[in-house]
């Protein structure tokens, strides 16, 4: 008789090799005041500098605005743009007063063109007010482990106020979380979007054209924050997120770092999200589970699943072609 075991696993339960756990600050090619590269599955730091330094992050905070809108399950609602939306300064999608747009349209305008008018319209519709929406932003930040983040608005403002404060690490955590949302992933990776009655919006994220494995990203800039950029990429099963704060050549830096780590590491998947048929058992996992291995050990290995006599999954093991055994213990 087949059995179903439900495995409750946190992001931190993913096993990785020891040589991926050191923070390497030796990169001298690019300048970034703060940067971090993390494994999106377990949020482990692969490399970084000033990763927990709190500072203004500009428009990359709109990733949070977008994910809250998408998680409201109201993306096909049609919204009448308020008058105040037309008065927002900075980047805009040029909404007219009383113009009707879907929440989905607004999310595209927010992510591709960084529209502050889109951010205002989203925030007042979903939150009832800017303050109400900001509470949702900070609540979500706390929920997903952004320990050094405080949002004060739905867009980027840091001219006459403190602005949205966060860290490179926290923003990479946010991008890792957001990219698990199907709609966010689709929007963030879209290079152009035609909004009826308004315009065709071209994505400001140049990394989409520069690097084929890019999953998406968000740019930002203010005089206080300087250039900010958060992105994600996937290759050989390995999902990585990167954030740079005050980096002048950020697109090139992100591409360089992705190429660096994808040339060294790969991901071996043992369990996918949902039901997995393993031998005579069905295993349900809340997350995808696996291990990160050096790229040279990515192929020709063997995956083993160890069950107890009663059919309980005890651990999983990967045996490389040179005999190294790497175990994933589920119940530590």
State where each predicted segment sits.
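A general, composition-driven signal for non-globular sequence regions
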Residues: 12-13, 56, 303, 311
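Active-site-adjacent loops and short helices of periplasmic peptidoglycan-processing enzymes
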Residues: 17-180
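Domain-terminus/edge residues, biased toward the C-terminal soluble/receptor-binding domains
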Residues: 162-332
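Hydrophobic h-region of N-terminal signal peptides that target proteins for export
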Residues: 5-17
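N-terminal hydrophobic targeting signals that begin at the initiator methionine
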Residues: 1-2
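Short amphipathic alpha-helical "recognition" segments used for binding
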Residues: 6-7, 66, 316
């Amino acid at each position: 008789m087949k059995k179903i075991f439900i495995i409750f696993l946190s992001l931190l339960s993913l096993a990785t090799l020891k040589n991926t756990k050191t923070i390497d600050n030796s990169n001298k090619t690019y300048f970034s005041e703060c940067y971090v590269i993390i494994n999106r599955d377990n949020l482990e730091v692969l490399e970084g500098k000033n990763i927990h330094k709190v500072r203004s992050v500009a428009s990359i905070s709109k990733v949070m605005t977008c994910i809250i809108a998408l998680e409201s399950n109201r993306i096909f609602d049609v919204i009448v743009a308020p008058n105040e939306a037309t008065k927002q300064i900075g980047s805009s999608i040029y909404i007219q007063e009383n113009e009707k747009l879907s929440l989905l349209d607004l999310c595209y305008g927010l992510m591709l063109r960084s529209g502050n008018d889109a951010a205002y319209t989203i925030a007042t519709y979903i939150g009832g007010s800017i303050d109400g929406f900001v509470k949702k932003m900070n609540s979500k930040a706390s929920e997903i482990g952004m320990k050094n983040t405080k949002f004060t608005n739905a867009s980027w403002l840091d001219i006459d106020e403190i602005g949205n404060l966060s860290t490179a690490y926290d923003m990479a955590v946010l991008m890792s979380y957001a990219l698990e949302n199907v709609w966010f992933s689709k929007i963030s990776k879209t290079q152009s979007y035609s909004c009826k009655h308004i315009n065709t919006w071209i994505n400001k994220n140049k990394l989409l054209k520069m690097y084929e494995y890019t999953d998406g990203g968000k740019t930002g800039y203010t005089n206080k924050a300087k250039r900010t950029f958060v992105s994600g990429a996937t290759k050989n099963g390995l999902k990585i997120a990167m954030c740079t704060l005050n980096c002048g050549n950020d697109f090139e830096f992100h591409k360089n770092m992705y190429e660096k780590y994808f040339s060294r590491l790969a991901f071996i998947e043992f369990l996918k999200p949902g039901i997995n048929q393993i031998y005579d058992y069905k295993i349900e996992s809340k997350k995808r589970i696996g291990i990160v291995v050096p790229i040279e050990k990515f192929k020709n290995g063997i995956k083993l699943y160890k069950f107890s006599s009663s059919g309980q999954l005890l651990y999983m093991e990967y045996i490389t072609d040179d005999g190294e055994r790497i175990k994933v213990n589920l119940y530590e």
